[in-house]
């Protein structure tokens, strides 16, 4: 079990598991800190020498707080990128998967499903797939279906001006207005 406490913006981790002892690759059912020569730092729970359970991972301005399974982000978690973008939601084997919210540093936001199970970075967000809502920083909003990161299927685009485009979308273009 993991208990997390945020004090002055810093995450403090506490676990009911005992402190890890001995060689790293033997750590199991324990809580510890692992730092690499490349600057990676993980504070959390371990099983068979792997990140497993609740943990906090940091590296070069990036931070993940959440669940791990067999050394991969898996379950609920929050990943903050060094550019200020943030993903909050479900993970499966190190990838966005299931329900989640991606908040861009410019204020844009996508809330919805992530299905394709590919690794994502702020430059490669092709995973919006299924039903979702994308709110632009200027107030425009699209609510509808997505495929491979593009508006695709039934959807409504509402502009801040009040103009509405509704109908069937294909590859980000309205093809059958309602």
What is the predicted role of each segment?
Residues 6-178:
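Glycine/tyrosine- and acidic-biased, solvent-exposed loop/turn segments at the edges of beta-strands
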Residues 1-3:
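Sec-dependent signal peptide recognition
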């Amino acid at each position: 079990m993991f208990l997390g406490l945020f004090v002055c913006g810093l995450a403090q981790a506490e676990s009911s598991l005992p402190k890890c002892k001995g060689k790293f690759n033997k750590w199991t059912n324990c809580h510890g800190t692992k730092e690499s020569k490349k600057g990676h730092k993980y504070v959390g729970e371990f099983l068979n020498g792997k990140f497993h359970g609740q943990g906090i991972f940091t590296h070069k301005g990036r931070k993940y707080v959440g669940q791990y399974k067999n050394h991969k982000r898996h379950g609920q978690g929050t990943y903050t990128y060094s550019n200020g973008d943030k993903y909050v939601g479900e993970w499966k084997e190190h990838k966005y998967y299931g329900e989640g919210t991606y908040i861009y540093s410019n204020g844009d936001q996508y809330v919805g499903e992530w299905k394709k199970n590919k690794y994502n970075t702020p430059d490669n967000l092709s995973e919006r797939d299924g039903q979702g809502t994308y709110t632009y920083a200027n107030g425009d909003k699209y609510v509808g279906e997505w495929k491979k990161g593009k508006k695709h299927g039934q959807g409504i685009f509402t502009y801040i001006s009040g103009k509405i485009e509704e109908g069937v979308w294909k590859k980000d273009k309205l093809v059958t207005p309602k």
